[in-house]
Amino acid sequence: LAGSHLRSAYELKQNLIGIGLLWKYGYYDQERNQDQTLNVAWNEKQYSFLEDTGIKFQITIHEHPVWVKAFYLNPETFKSAPLFLLTTDLPENDYVSQTITHRLYDANVATKVAQFILLGVGGAKLVDLLNFNPDRYHLNEAHGLSAAFYLYQKFNRQLPEVTKRLVFTTHTPEEAGNEKHDIYLCHKMSYFCGLTIDEVKKLYQNDSDQFNHSLAALRFARLANGVSRLHGEVSRAMWSKYENICPILSITNAQNWRYWADKQLYRFMEAGDNFGIDDRKKYLKKRAFEIVADQTGKLFNPEVFTIVWARRFAGYKRAALLTRDEKRFEKLLSLNDGLIN
């Protein structure tokens, strides 16, 4: 989604840059053993298309200086807005600091908080080193919220100066899915950029010892959004019990179809050619089932309606949601409008 966002920003000529982390291994690759059982493999990624900016700087993580290096994805490489990626996998760092950018979704809580600091504080500091003066800092989820504490210190502890520059996108429709960490751990990890725990609790108006990243983002930002009309409604209801949060709008997520979608299928759609759409879909479906058969040995009938879960299969993504209301689901399947095949 983030990559698609940057492609669209490039096409629209929007004045925007992206900042992320450069993963050495990323999320694990699922491979199959000879007996078809799954194997988890951590393969080192290759980034020959990135440019070394020569920018190196230090941030504080766990009360310790950590070196950060910035790499750059040129807009012309993939026709995307400028993207900077940060890594700590450097010989100047100790091994623990190097591993901060090794694995996405690291199970170690301290490593995860360190990643949040790198993204937020490291990203905001990079913007300063580039001599940019952005009108807006956009947080995609609350993973980079530590940037708000960096900006708070930068603007002489004037929260309104942070708020007028900060916007926030929330994706998670369940409060339990929003990140919370022990506030004492966050403080020990240097997440709060020198603020005391009492100062943090007062600043984001919460006395809990569990630091709620999303709640802090909603109180620090001038504006937030959910990722669809319904999700916006769910988010407003979910956070309504909290006072002094910013307005939550609805902005529907979308993908840059020019990159990922089948071009011929869209040509038929634009031409209103229902026969062409149906024929092309059947061809693509058959090709997909051939890949599944090759990898798993399972055969699927292209003439049977098939639901495909094209996402990481994690419980909080709620794969069973589609059939939660079985009567409504059956009604959708029985509609004779040619949309389901």
What are these regions (language model features)?
Residues 1-341:
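Catalytic cores of carbohydrate-active enzymes across secretory and cytosolic contexts
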